[in-house]
């Protein structure tokens, strides 16, 4: 599973404090859902999360639960405080590599 906040890069340029606040809320919502569905967060890149799961049902359940939780959260907030994410799903073998240690 890959997640990414919509508009986060622009927001960090416009209002860094708000961007960091929303990122913390984002993490408070998403992390427990991934954990509940036996997922593992294997990488973070700013506002993006890469998580792995052993079963396809766990991936789908997590994606639906995350979008539902964010929708409920966003109803209570103004447009400028909305957290909107994109989620990409893939099922199959995953190869993770630490590119920091690769010499070019």
Give the label of every model feature segment.
Residues 1-65, 69-72:
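Catalytic NTP-binding/metal-coordinating core of nucleotidyl cyclase/transferase enzymes
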Residues 19, 78-80, 102:
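Alpha-helix N-cap/helix-initiation motif
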Residues 81-97:
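A short glycine-enriched loop-to-beta-strand structural element that forms part of the catalytic core
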Residues 70-81:
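Active-site phosphate-binding and catalytic loops of NTP-dependent enzymes
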Residues 96-104:
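Catalytic-core segments of nucleotide cyclases and related cyclic-nucleotide turnover enzymes
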């Amino acid at each position: 599973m890959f997640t990414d906040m919509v508009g986060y890069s622009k927001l960090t340029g416009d209002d860094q404090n708000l961007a960091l606040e929303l990122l913390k809320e984002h993490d408070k919502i998403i992390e427990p859902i991934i954990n509940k569905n036996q997922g593992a967060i294997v990488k973070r890149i700013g506002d993006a999360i890469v998580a792995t799961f052993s079963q396809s049902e766990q991936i789908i359940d997590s994606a639906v639960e995350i979008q539902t939780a964010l929708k409920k959260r966003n109803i209570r907030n103004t447009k400028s405080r909305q957290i909107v994410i994109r989620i990409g799903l893939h099922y199959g073998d995953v190869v993770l590599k630490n590119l920091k240690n690769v010499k070019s």
